[in-house]
């Protein structure tokens, strides 16, 4: 029996985040007929590494509005590579990542609009401040969206599940206190080229058809996540809430011939 289409909302603290940590999963859900929306609360200027490097070198103030537009277009283009056309960019400043009530309200508005069954976002204690703050605001927005909000026509809504990225934000001692063992592993082997194309749209952060960065990270991060599942590429997630069953489930979906575990498909990927 076919399941009903789901509404999936991915939230990243910066424009690249949802793509690098869940882009393959997003593409899989689109292919399954689900509605996928990606949301970025900030303009992401603090992570425009190309502009930051140039400014450090020449000390000439760039056109900040042009840089913000560039970052926004990259996210739109990257999402399109995955088949995602519903891209929400709230455009708030990310220089000092703090919880902002207005952003919480706006995230709650998006929740009320798309009524997600699933939200995918960063781990709550991710050591990148913009990641952790985005998740804190997301959880607060979920609380707000679950009740009656004066002046809002959205029905109260609570997603069935939240999945946190099971990858480290940075390599530092803070991350040692966070579980990175996934409760769910999504086989993204069939969508790994789509994810590579999406990541190569992020030229402001060193990606692109002429850069080896995506091939390196794709094999290192997504390849590593698939090892114990005996699949070439995967994305890992940690469920926020326990799932309820009448009997214990055994999920066999996605099992592959273990001989393909070491396939390195990105060696053959030809960027456009």
Predicted regions: what they are:
Residues 1-114, 144, 250, 257:
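Active-site rim/loop-helix segments in enzyme catalytic domains that contact anionic ligands
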Residues 1-11, 85-86, 97-272:
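Metal-dependent de-N-acetylase/amidase catalytic core
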